[in-house]
A protein has these predicted regions:
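The catalytic "switch" region of P-loop NTPases
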Residues: 2-7, 171-284
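Amphipathic alpha-helical "lid/sensor" segments that cap RecA-like P-loop NTPase cores
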Residues: 265-333
Length: 415
């Protein structure tokens, strides 16, 4: 006996409001559901196609669709003869030059194997040993010393001092890229994600990490990097390594509606019956205003609210699209309870005081010192709580201006 499917009430197989990144290797979240961003997509592809190597950056607020855009660009490049893999390379906040170089080498190695499973030869052997050693050691600096001989098959694993990867890695990376180009690849495209993880504590250190491997690893012919993050446009040091970032603006409301329609169609349960939208258009319009471009937050709000409301519906009932009043009431109660539980009394009261001024307002720490009548360290601590709870986000700094903070759609729904 099949289990109940709430979304079947609308002739849908599952929730159309998933927040997972679209991927080329996923049937559940395929790239064919991608909508909009044609100008940005073409700009990124043109830069790749016009250069022997490239370093591009995509910036924008959290949840706006940066990662999915780059996944789509990778698929486009793959179709044009470039090699890539479906993996997204994370950048660690506590990484070092060696670790970042190792991640790049691993990404190129994975791309080679994904596109040429029978790859062999000294270049591949050398990369394989280095990558395996890095992964077995959890990214540590125990690497292989490569023996001399035909095919490079003679090797001995030895523990090397810190910095060994910086000595061997660039050569192995260069040779592996040449191998790929010699096998017909027009280049290799890698996706580095979440530059904010590298930059949030110290922008100059982030730039030092990137500059530290730029000449050794980032400039090789055939290597095309696209780095994604929320902060790349605000740090000139990082921009000295990558091109001027492509800053994404929110999808227009019409594109969001198109995105939802594509998902409804893709998830149609019974082809003999039409699907029905689970939510009325005014609901999407209202949430679009509240979340101000945060598509991930908008989709999560729709999924949370509609799932809760559908749970009260009898199986087999003729269900109309969820209306605005019902959804807002459900989300207000849900978000309010969750935030109060996470924040505690003091931080919650300060969030309410901010909302009473204007929930859509941007505030600096100096303004919040005056609003909350507390000292700056207390404001900083409260903001950290609010950010961790998903109630507030810090906007990218503009030059030397003070950082501005904004209440998220999740918090605005609760207040």
């Amino acid at each position: 006996m099949p289990l109940p499917n709430l979304w079947g009430l609308y002739n849908l197989r599952s929730s159309p409001f998933f927040q997972a990144t679209l991927r080329a290797d996923s049937d559940a979240t395929p790239l064919r559901l991608f909508v909009g961003r044609q100008r940005e997509r073409q700009l990124l592809l043109t830069t790749i196609g016009s250069s022997a190597s490239s370093r591009q950056a995509v910036a924008g607020r959290p949840g706006i669709g940066k990662t999915t855009l780059v996944q789509t660009v990778k698929a486009d490049a793959q179709a044009a003869g470039y090699w890539s893999s479906n993996e997204i390379i994370p950048i660690s906040a506590d990484g070092a030059n060696e670790q970042l170089l190792g991640q790049l080498l691993s990404g190129v190695y994975d791309a080679v194997l994904a596109n040429c499973p029978t790859a062999a030869g000294p270049e591949v052997e050398a990369a394989q040993q280095l990558v395996r050693s890095l992964r077995l050691r959890g990214g540590g600096l125990t690497v292989s010393a490569f023996g001399v001989g035909i095919g490079g098959s003679q090797s001995e694993s030895v523990a090397t001092p810190p910095g060994a990867l910086l000595l061997d890695g660039p050569r192995v990376l260069r040779d592996l890229l040449r191998y790929a180009l010699g096998r017909g690849a027009r280049g290799i495209v890698l996706h580095l994600n979440n530059l904010e993880n590298l930059s949030e504590a110290d922008a100059s250190r982030a730039a030092d990490l990137l500059r530290g491997i730029r000449d050794q690893a980032l400039l090789h012919d055939g290597l095309h990097l696209i780095v994604v993050g929320t902060v790349v446009q605000s740090h000139t040091q990082i921009r000295s390594v990558f091109s001027d970032p492509l800053v994404l603006e929110p999808l227009e409301l019409a594109a969001v509606m198109q995105l939802l329609a594509h998902r409804y169609e893709a998830l149609q349960l019974d082809p003999a019956r039409p699907w029905r939208p689970p939510v009325a258009e005014p609901v999407v319009q209202k949430l679009y205003e509240l979340f101000r471009g945060d598509l991930r937050g908008l989709l999560k709000a729709l999924e949370d609210g509609i799932t809760a409301l559908l749970g009260l519906t009898s199986a087999g009932a003729d269900v109309a699209p969820v209306g605005l009043d019902d959804l807002l009431l459900t989300l207000r109660q849900r978000n309010q309870a969750e935030l109060q539980d996470q924040l505690g009394e003091s931080a919650w009261e300060r969030l309410v005081a901010w909302a009473q001024v204007d929930p859509a307002s941007m505030q600096t720490q100096a303004q919040l010192v005056a609003l909350w009548a507390v000292k700056q360290p207390s404001v900083s601590q409260t903001l950290q709580q609010l950010i961790e709870a998903g109630a507030v986000e810090a906007l990218p700094r503009r030059g030397r201006e003070a950082i501005r903070y904004l209440m998220t759609g999740t918090a605005r729904l609760a207040l």
